[in-house]
Amino acid sequence: MSDTADRVQKIVVEHLGVEADKVNQEASFIDDLGADSLDIVELVMAFEEEFGVEIPDDAAEKISTVGDATKYIEEHKG
């Protein structure tokens, strides 16, 4: 796993209180990890802070899996 993927996983575990082994790149925040819309907003804000990226609302709406978040961050971080 890349450094970005490791950091994304850590944030997801901390914010959603799920086991690390459930957080893989294919895991859906809502369907697999039990997140709700507020959790998603908090995760996006945590990703923005951790990685120094801005994730606009239209992009955030397309991020539904851990892999989506990792890919977006890797493509947009400085």
From Swiss-Prot:
InterPro entries attached to this UniProt entry: ACP (IPR003231), ACP-like_sf (IPR036736), PP-bd_ACP (IPR009081), Ppantetheine_attach_site (IPR006162)
GO biological process: lipid A biosynthetic process
Entry annotated with the keyword Lipid metabolism: yes
Keyword Lipid metabolism applies: yes
Disulfide linkage: none
Domain (Carrier): residue spans on this chain: 2-77
PTM annotation, UniProt: 4'-phosphopantetheine is transferred from CoA to a specific serine of apo-ACP by AcpS. This modification is essential for activity because fatty acids are bound in thioester linkage to the sulfhydryl of the prosthetic group.
Residue(s) carrying O-(pantetheine 4'-phosphoryl)serine: S37
Pathway(s) the chain acts in: Lipid metabolism; fatty acid biosynthesis
Database matches in Gene3D superfamilies: ACP-like
Keywords assigned by UniProt, alphabetized: Cytoplasm, Fatty acid biosynthesis, Fatty acid metabolism, Lipid biosynthesis, Lipid metabolism, Phosphopantetheine, Phosphoprotein
Main location as per UniProt: cytoplasm
One Pfam family per UniProt: PP-binding
Cellular location(s): Cytoplasm
GO cellular component, one term: cytosol
The organism's place on the tree of life at top rank: Bacteria
Entry similarity comment: Belongs to the acyl carrier protein (ACP) family.
Described purpose of this protein according to its UniProt entry: Carrier of the growing fatty acid chain in fatty acid biosynthesis.
NCBIfam families per the UniProt record, alphabetical: acyl_carrier, PRK00982.1-2, PRK00982.1-3, PRK00982.1-4, PRK00982.1-5
Protein name: Acyl carrier protein
Gene name of the record: acpP
